[in-house]
Structures are given as C-alpha cells and as structure tokens.
Design a protein with these regions (language model features):
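ABC family nucleotide-binding domain
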Residues: 1-144
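H-loop (His-switch) and adjacent beta-strand-loop-beta switch element
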Residues: 141-153
C-alpha cells in the first residue's frame, strides 16, 4: 500500500473500502440512487443494475430512489449511506458511529444490515462505537483510550 500513488490509493479506497459515517455524508443534490452509486460513477464504471436493485430491496429503499436526502428520515439516510458503502462489494467496511444519531429501532435495523453484509458477503466490518450493546454484538472488541489500546477481547471465535 505504501508504494501506491495517490491515484492508486483513491481507486483502492473506492473499490475495497466502504465507509459509513455518523452524519451520513450524503450529497444533498443527488437522489438516493445517485448517492448509492456514487463510488461506481467516480470510478468511471457502469452501474450493476442487479446489484443496485438488490441493495435497494435489502435496505428497504424501494420506491425512494428519486428522493433527495432532505426528503428522508435519519434512518433512511443512514440506509442510503450503507448502500453507498456496500455498492462496490468492498472487502472492508468501516463504520464510524453508524447508529449515533438514530433511535433504538433504527439502530437495531442498521446494525442488522451491517452484520448481514459481514456474514453473507464475508466483508470485514470495523465499527467505532460508544454504545456498549452494539460493541457486544461484535466478534472482537478493541478498547482505545487516549490513542492507546487498553484491551483486546474476543467475544466469539
């Protein structure tokens, strides 16, 4: 990775790493479909319509494709952000407080979607969270304080 150019690193990130942000980071002038397919567009590739339809179904976003982010609830916006992160079927999904701004029900649903990607697609899921219940659903918990690892515990084998 260190020998790659900035351009090669950008391509690697777009194709191999899916990012889910706490505050969604959706492009406000793009609709749901455009936001989800943004990594593909940035890569200059054509959209796999079957993959898009499958994601829209899985995320419960069918019928919302032409809506703008400001026309969606917080839970729906986070689902769009997850769709964008998963569109390229990345090897790694990094989720920074993916449920931080959501109510309990939406938090459960979002985590179920991420766990499904981990289980069904074999994607490595790394979640940063302050929510103990979410942390306890992991296979492994690494606690960090002041930039240092203070514990590393396997929950499941």
């Amino acid at each position: 990775i260190y020998a790659r150019t900035d351009e090669q690193l950008a391509v690697f990130r777009r194709r191999e790493v899916g990012l889910v942000y706490q505050f969604y980071n959706l492009v406000p002038i793009l609709n749901v479909i455009e936001n989800i397919t943004l990594p593909v567009a940035l890569d200059g590739r054509s959209v796999n319509e079957e993959r898009l339809a499958s994601l829209m179904r899985t995320l419960g976003l069918e019928g919302y494709g032409n809506r703008l982010p400001n026309q969606l609830s917080g839970g729906q916006q986070q689902r769009v952000a997850i769709g964008r992160a998963l569109m390229n079927n990345p090897a790694i999904v990094l989720a920074d407080e993916p449920t931080g701004n959501l109510d309990t029900q939406n938090s459960r649903e979002i985590m179920a979607l991420l766990e499904s990607a981990n289980r069904d697609a074999g994607q490595t899921l790394i979640v940063i969270t302050h929510d103990e219940d979410i942390a306890l659903s992991a296979d492994r918990i690494i606690a960090i304080e002041d930039g240092r690892i203070v514990s590393d515990e396997r929950i499941r084998a």
